[in-house]
C-alpha cells in the first residue's frame, strides 16, 4: 500500500499565484497525499483561497497564523502537524509537475531512500523567460554519498547546485524532522538547514529531471534591496554549515572555497554601500585574512 505523503505549503500574500499552485498539487498522479496550507498572516486573499480549497477537497488542511512569523516558522508549523511518512515542501508561487511526487516516491520504494532530490527550472517574471538546467541527455538517477552531496551544494557543478540547497522538489522522511528544523528570523534559512537532513540520511537519491517550476518574482525576499543583515546571516550560516561538516568528518575544502568566494562578494558589496566601518565588514576582512594567510603558508598564493 502506498504511504501517505504530506505536502507543506507556506503562504504569505501569494493570492495571485496560489490557485494555480494548489491545483497542480491536487492533480498529482500520486493521490495518497495531504496538503497542509499554512497561511502566514497574509493580508491579501490568500487565507480565503486556502479555506475554499479545504471545503472542496478533504485532503486539504489549513493553518492560519494571525501574525507573520516568516517562511521558516510556517514550514515548521506545517511539518509539526504532518501525518505523512514523507514530507515535501512547495512554495506557494511555484508549480509542481503532475508526476513529481510519484517520480520521487518511486525511488523511496526502489531504493529505500530517506531523501530523494529532484531538480527544477525557472520562470523569471522580470523578462518572461524560462530557464532550464536539465535537458534530455542530462537525465539521470543517482544514489549519492554525503560527501558528494556537500561538494555539489558548494561547488561550481555541471548540473545545478541550488537543487541541493532549496527545500522544495524533495521527499524527506518525516522522522528526520525530529532532529532538524528550519531556522527562523534570518535569510538563507535553506542554506542553514538542508545539509543537516543529508547528514542524517542513510540513503540519498538524486533525480536530475525538471519536476518543479520555480518562479523568480521581483518582490521576493531574495530579490529585495541589500541590507547589512545579509552579511551577518551569510557568515553565520556558513560557519554553522562548515562546523557541522567538520564534526561529521567530511572534507570541507570545496565548501571552504565557496565560503571565501561569498565573503569576497559581500566585502565588495559592503564597500559599494560605504559600510566599511561596520563590524560586519571587519569580520569579513578578518576571515579573508585567515584564508589568505593559510594559503600563503601552504604555498598556494
UniProtKB/Swiss-Prot annotation:
Keyword entries, A-Z: Glycosyltransferase, Transferase
Alphabetical list of InterPro entries matching this protein: Glyco_trans_2-like, Nucleotide-diphossugar_trans
Pathway: Protein modification; protein glycosylation
Consequence of changing residue 93 to A: No longer transfers glucose to an acceptor protein
One annotated GO molecular function: glycosyltransferase activity
Superkingdom in the source lineage: Bacteria
Keyword Glycosyltransferase: yes
Keyword hit for Phosphoprotein: no
GO biological process: protein glycosylation
Similarity section: Belongs to the glycosyltransferase 2 family.
Function (record text): Involved in the polymorphic O-glycosylation of the serine-rich repeat protein PsrP. Catalyzes the third step in glycosylation PsrP in this bacteria. Transfers glucose from UDP-glucose to the terminal glucose moiety of already-glycosylated PsrP (using truncated substrates with PsrP SSR1-GlcNAc-Glc). Has a marked preference for PsrP substrate that has already been modified by GlcNAc and glucose. In vitro has hydrolytic activity against UDP-glucose and to a lesser extent against UDP-galactose.
Misc. comment: Encoded in RD10, a pathogenicity island with an atypical GC content that is associated with invasive pneumococcal disease. Pathogenicity islands account for greater than half the genomic diversity observed between isolates. The main function of this island seems to be correct synthesis and export of pneumococcal serine-rich repeat protein PsrP.
Annotated protein name in UniProt: Glycosyltransferase GlyG
Upper classification of the organism: Bacteria, Bacillati, Bacillota, Bacilli, Lactobacillales
Gene behind the chain: glyG
Amino acid at each position: 500500500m502506498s504511504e501517505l505523503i504530506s505536502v507543506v505549503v507556506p503562504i504569505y500574500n501569494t493570492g495571485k499565484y496560489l490557485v494555480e499552485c494548489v491545483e497542480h498539487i491536487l492533480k498529482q498522479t500520486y493521490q495518497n497525499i495531504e496538503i497542509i496550507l499554512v497561511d502566514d498572516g497574509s493580508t491579501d486573499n490568500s487565507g480565503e483561497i486556502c479555506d475554499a480549497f479545504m471545503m472542496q477537497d478533504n485532503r486539504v488542511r489549513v493553518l492560519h497564523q494571525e501574525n507573520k512569523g516568516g517562511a521558516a516558522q510556517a514550514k515548521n508549523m506545517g511539518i509539526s502537524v504532518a501525518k505523512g511518512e514523507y514530507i515535501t515542501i512547495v512554495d506557494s508561487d511555484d508549480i509542481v509537475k503532475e508526476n513529481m511526487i510519484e517520480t520521487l516516491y518511486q525511488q523511496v520504494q526502489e531504493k529505500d531512500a530517506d531523501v530523494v532530490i529532484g531538480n527544477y527550472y525557472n520562470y523569471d517574471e522580470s523578462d518572461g523567460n524560462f530557464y532550464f538546467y536539465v535537458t534530455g541527455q542530462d537525465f539521470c538517477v543517482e544514489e549519492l554519498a554525503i560527501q558528494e552531496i556537500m561538494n555539489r551544494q558548494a561547488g561550481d557543478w555541471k548540473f545545478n547546485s541550488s537543487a541541493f540547497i532549496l527545500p522544495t522538489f524533495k521527499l524527506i522522511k518525516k522522522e528526520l524532522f525530529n532532529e532538524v528544523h528550519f531556522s527562523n528570523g534570518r535569510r538563507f534559512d535553506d542554506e542553514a538547514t538542508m545539509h543537516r537532513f543529508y547528514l542524517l540520511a542513510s540513503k540519498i537519491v538524486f533525480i536530475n529531471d525538471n519536476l518543479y517550476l520555480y518562479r523568480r518574482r521581483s518582490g521576493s525576499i531574495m530579490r529585495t534591496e541589500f541590507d547589512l543583515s545579509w552579511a551577518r546571516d551569510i557568515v553565520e550560516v556558513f560557519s554553522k554549515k562548515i562546523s557541522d561538516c567538520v564534526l561529521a568528518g567530511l572534507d570541507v575544502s570545496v565548501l571552504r572555497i565557496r565560503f571565501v568566494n561569498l565573503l569576497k562578494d559581500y566585502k565588495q558589496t559592503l564597500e559599494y554601500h560605504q559600510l566599511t566601518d561596520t563590524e560586519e565588514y571587519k569580520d569579513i576582512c578578518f576571515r579573508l585574512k585567515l584564508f589568505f594567510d593559510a594559503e600563503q603558508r601552504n604555498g598556494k598564493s
